[in-house]
């Protein structure tokens, strides 16, 4: 989860988020090098007194500044496309959870189990226990098994919402009348926090998401107790 005054990304807890962080660093390095080169050339132009008035064309230079940006764009596009396909790909999910957005709460249905569904509301500030996080705790957490592929089917009952958990690299729009898909695979157990990331009305800020990732055996015990 995020901390006060944090400048970087949240710690990665899924393969997708690890790839996204690597891509962020890769792209940032390219942007830094280009910016440094441009600033250096601007400083050079402002500080030098030399001029070249007789140059009418420079085909070699034009070739370089056409090919070089194309190579840079390819260096950015290839890893981006790889991550895009990784996010869309899902092979033999062990579990499917249907997520519905409402004003202003989430509802979850474990489609592989009978009668395993519940609503998830934010816990009001005056009902929080010591150590709980304001505006982030819910009365019913989503409990999922770790290290296994899980499919999330996401939609909405009313207006546009967005189901997002940053540390897992997830952000999927919940659109009325449309079913979107996302994949979750957590590398480790833990509790992961997210929020609705689409302005959806006056209580948009009060739609937290809490995922609890646990070992498969504990998940089986939890699902039996819930049904």
From Swiss-Prot:
Amino-acid positions noted as binding Mg(2+) in the UniProt annotation, renumbered to this chain: 198
Annotated membrane topology: Multi-pass membrane protein
Q: What class of enzyme is it?
A: translocase
Where does the sequence pass through the membrane?
15-45, 60-87
- Out of the domains of life, which is the source? Eukaryota
GO BP of this protein: ATP synthesis coupled electron transport
Catalysed reactions, semicolon-separated: 4 Fe(II)-[cytochrome c] + O2 + 8 H(+)(in) = 4 Fe(III)-[cytochrome c] + 2 H2O + 4 H(+)(out)
Sorted alphabetically, the Gene Ontology cellular component annotations on this record are: mitochondrial inner membrane; respiratory chain complex IV
Q: List the stretches on the Mitochondrial intermembrane face of the membrane.
A: 1-14, 88-227
Enzyme Commission number(s): 7.1.1.9
Fill in the subunit field for this protein. Component of the cytochrome c oxidase (complex IV, CIV), a multisubunit enzyme composed of 14 subunits. The complex is composed of a catalytic core of 3 subunits MT-CO1, MT-CO2 and MT-CO3, encoded in the mitochondrial DNA, and 11 supernumerary subunits COX4I, COX5A, COX5B, COX6A, COX6B, COX6C, COX7A, COX7B, COX7C, COX8 and NDUFA4, which are encoded in the nuclear genome.
Instruction: Note how many cofactor molecules are bound and how.
Output: Binds a dinuclear copper A center per subunit.
Where is it localised? Mitochondrion inner membrane
Q: Which SUPFAM superfamilies does the record cross-reference, listed alphabetically?
A: Cupredoxins (SSF49503), Cytochrome c oxidase subunit II-like, transmembrane region (SSF81464)
- Asked if the keyword Transferase belongs to this entry, the reply reads no
This chain belongs to the protein called Cytochrome c oxidase subunit 2
Broad class of where this protein is predominantly found = mitochondrion
Alphabetized GO MF terms: copper ion binding; cytochrome-c oxidase activity
Q: Where does Cu cation A2 bind?
A: 196, 198, 200, 204
Per UniProt, Cu cation A1 binds at 161, 196, 200, 207
- So which cofactors does this thing need? Cu cation
Q: Which UniProt keywords apply?
A: Copper, Electron transport, Magnesium, Membrane, Metal-binding, Mitochondrion, Mitochondrion inner membrane, Respiratory chain, Translocase, Transmembrane, Transmembrane helix, Transport
Q: Name one Pfam family in it.
A: COX2
